[in-house]
Amino acid sequence: LCPQNHVIEFMTLLVILKISLAGLFFGYYLKEHFEKNHAAISIFATAYALCGFSAAYAWDIMWLDCMMLAPLVVLGLEQLIKEKKVLLYYISLSLCIISNYYIAIMVCIFQVIWFVITWLENKETGIGAWIRFAIYSLLAGGTGAILIIPEAITLGASGSQNISFPDTMEW
């Protein structure tokens, strides 16, 4: 993909791209959520992109994927509840799970909390919102399972299979 002597520059470019897209996607989320195009959106989008998480984990670029996709997942969830649109939620959550299932677990926990809060504000959507949320969350998880299950099988068959905690601790 890139010459060996430019790997560091390529990785730096990827980090910059992911952090920039995180800010862009968060700005888009704020614009759609509040239905306003205000100058403060740029400030908050920049603050999100340059938050402590991105600074602390820029060395592990996989962890930036879910940070980048999280605003789209939340926007997709809001569209799923309010407008019965499911595509953005399904695609962004699937990509989040595929890109890094560890951070995606935290995103999914947040989605459950955010779903309940958003649904309580929009109770008129009824039980249909719950059904859509469950179905498309499970579909996104199933889509992610295409990679997660083979990874789990491979890890189970590797040398790390027999690693366990010690029975006793001796001081």
Task: For each feature predicted by the language model, list its residue ranges.
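Periplasmic/ER-lumenal interhelical loops and adjacent helix-loop junctions
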Residues: 1, 129-171
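Juxtamembrane segments of multi-pass membrane glycosylation machinery
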Residues: 1-13
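Transmembrane-helix motifs of polytopic, lipid-linked glycan transferases
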Residues: 13-34
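Transmembrane-helix signature of polytopic, membrane-embedded enzymes
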Residues: 27-50
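Short acidic/glycine- and proline-prone juxtamembrane loop motifs at membrane-interface regions
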Residues: 58-64
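Membrane-interface transmembrane helices that cradle and orient dolichyl/undecaprenyl
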Residues: 73-88, 120-121
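Membrane-interface alpha helices of multi-pass inner-membrane proteins
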Residues: 87-101, 139-142
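Perimembrane helix-loop-helix junctions
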Residues: 107-139
